[in-house]
Amino acid sequence: MLILFMESTMKLFELQSFEEGGLVATERGTPSPCLGEVVIKVQAASINFRDFMIAKGLYNPMLSLPMIPLSDGSGEVIAVGNDVKDFKVGDRVSSVFWQDWNSEQATRMSSTGCEAAGVLSEYAVLPQTAVLKIPDYMSYEEAATLPCAAVTAWTCIMAANIKAGDNVLFLGTGGVSIFGLQIAKAMGANVIITSSSDQKLERAIELGADTTINYKE
């Protein structure tokens, strides 16, 4: 086991109930990696609407509590299990939404930030299948926004075989739509996006939207 220096305890946020005030700042012992695991020092994390739904008990009301929320984060590898070959101490990585999704169907129990512990903590221990290296040109903050919304948008665009010149419609201005807008524009598509907010549509235009529709007008 290779370990960079880390504190014996860590700070984290823990969802202890679905009631108001259920998200509590606390401390735990800093985890050590088992076989097949890495420990990252979390540098950035982002919030998706799913995280809000989880905290309210609307996503999985039977979820076992307490748990550490948030699926999307990035950080530096500071410890690796003895059998880990693809990652080393010092690597910059981001989390992966489905921790066990390789060649087989992902299982719900591997969902980061829900059934599996999330990244709203100083340190996170994750299976080596649950992290990806991030390129040098990308900041931790940028990488922390990608695992859920951006990958969803990318998957949809790839599945639809979008090409330059195609017309692509995005409904709303949530995370998936905003990432989809930028990816589709990078591929040369003509992007149409909807919202009930003129302010949000102005932002969409700044990001490259060709046509905007306020569906309340």
Segments from the language model and where they lie:
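Short glycine/threonine/proline-enriched tight-turn/helix- or strand-capping micro-motif at secondary-structure
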Residues: 20-29, 58
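Glycine-rich beta-strand-centered segment in the early N-terminal region that forms part
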Residues: 30-45, 58-100, 117, 135-138
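Cytochrome P450 core scaffold surrounding the K-helix E-X-X-R motif
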Residues: 50-55
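NAD(P)H dinucleotide-binding glycine-rich loop of Rossmann-like/cofactor-binding domains
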Residues: 96-171, 206
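Adenosine-nucleotide cofactor-binding segment
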Residues: 167-173, 185-217
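N-terminal Rossmann-fold NAD(P) dinucleotide-binding loop
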Residues: 177-178
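Conserved SAM-binding loop of SAM-dependent methyltransferases across substrates and taxa
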Residues: 182
